[in-house]
Every structure is written in structure tokens, then in C-alpha cells.
Amino acid sequence: MVNKDMVGRVGPKFDMVVERGKVREFARATGSDNADYLDDSEAVSPPTFLTTVAFWQPPEAGDLYRQLDIDLRRLLHGEQEFVFLREPPRAGTVLHAQTIVEEIYEKEGKRGGVMAFVVMRTDFTDDDGAVVAQSRSTAIETGARS
């Protein structure tokens, strides 16, 4: 079962470079032909581009996930939310990011067993430390089958 003592635990800080080529690749992979995402000079990142943050995290960020003690065989991605406090980042922007375990709660599953919900928030800040965007994801560890 998920380690509930992890609520409030903060992962390492890391940088995420918004690269023009990666913005274009992401836009094409998601079927978008929006010119704002494909602009060669100042491409705007699509709102869900921040999901790529997992590729930028340093190896020690995995410690946060390991310490949660989630059974990966029973893991589901439950929800994803993005909040932009400023305009979406443009190509060339460097975002500073950090993830926190915001909440862990349980619900009885309909097919047996208790499900654990882990809500994690990643804050993306600019060079001045102002929060530009937040990503909130909910992982679900499904109940063990008896």
C-alpha cells in the first residue's frame, strides 16, 4: 500500500528547457496544426506540453516515486490538470520545476480492494521565482485482487 507519510514530500528542483523542435514534435504527435505551435521563431508550447516534464527530471526524482511504495503492476493514470498563471511558455524558455506530493487518500474499489490515490503537483517557475504554471496529476493504485 502507498506510503501516506509522503504527503508534503518535495522532489529535487530541475530545469526544463522548452525547445522549439520538441514543441513542434509534440504538436504534430497530438495532431495539432496550430501555427502558434509550429512557428519557427517563437513557438508557443501547447497546454499539455508540460506532460513531457517526466523526461527532464533528474534520476534522483525517481526516489520520490520509489518512496511512495506504489505497486507499479496496479498503477493507473487517473487525472491530469494544468493551470497557467501566465501565458504558456514559448520556445527558448527555461522553466524551473519541482514536484510535491500534495495528497494521498483511499477509496473502496467496486471490484474489490482499497484504491490509493496519489495527487502530485509540479510547479513551474521563471527565473524570478514566479509560478508560471502548475501540473497536477493523480495516480491510482488499484486494489489488490483477492
Segments and roles (model prediction):
Residues M1-E79:
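Hot-dog-fold acyl-thioester-processing enzymes
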Residues M1-V2, F84-S146:
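HotDog/MaoC-like acyl-thioester-processing domains
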